[in-house]
């Protein structure tokens, strides 16, 4: 077994706060993404306990983007589809959707009420609606998405 001396921390011991800790978990999940155009990781947390993790990519059993599974991502990489266009043709599940589905698969949907969603990217409208529906009460995100509906989050009481 190999022992890791550091994980990107500086020489002085800087213990991450909870938001930093769980965002690091989302960043780690992002590394599993098989999407050609954007890698996103997400973690659902309640009471400082990680409930589920997700990253964007094709569904199980479907060729991933690196293998040519998603034609939309392939066309995007070739410059034939603009960013944000033809998303309905993308085969990749979003990281947030995968984390939400994993909660359902694992039968922990009741434990999600009041949870926090950590994501390396602000969720799209569809993922935002799913998160609100299952009871997510706070989003912590690193990057923004132009179509994010902040009014919807405010109306639903999501921080």
Model feature map: region roles:
Residues 1-159:
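Zinc-dependent deaminase catalytic domain
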């Amino acid at each position: 077994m190999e022992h890791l001396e550091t994980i990107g921390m500086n020489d002085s011991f800087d213990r991450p706060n909870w938001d930093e800790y769980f965002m690091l978990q989302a960043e780690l999940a992002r590394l599993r993404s098989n999407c050609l155009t954007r890698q996103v990781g997400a973690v659902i947390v309640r009471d400082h306990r990680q409930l589920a993790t997700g990253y964007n990519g094709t569904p199980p059993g479907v060729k991933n983007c690196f293998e040519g599974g998603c034609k939309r991502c392939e066309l995007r990489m070739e410059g034939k589809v603009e960013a944000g266009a033809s998303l309905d043709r993308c085969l990749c599940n979003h990281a947030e959707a995968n984390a939400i589905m994993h909660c359902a698969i694992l039968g922990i949907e009741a434990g999600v009420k009041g949870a926090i969603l950590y994501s390396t990217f602000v969720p799209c409208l569809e993922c935002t609606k799913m998160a609100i529906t299952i009871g997510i009460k706070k989003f912590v995100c690193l990057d923004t998405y132009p179509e994010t509906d902040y009014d919807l989050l405010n109306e639903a009481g999501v921080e």
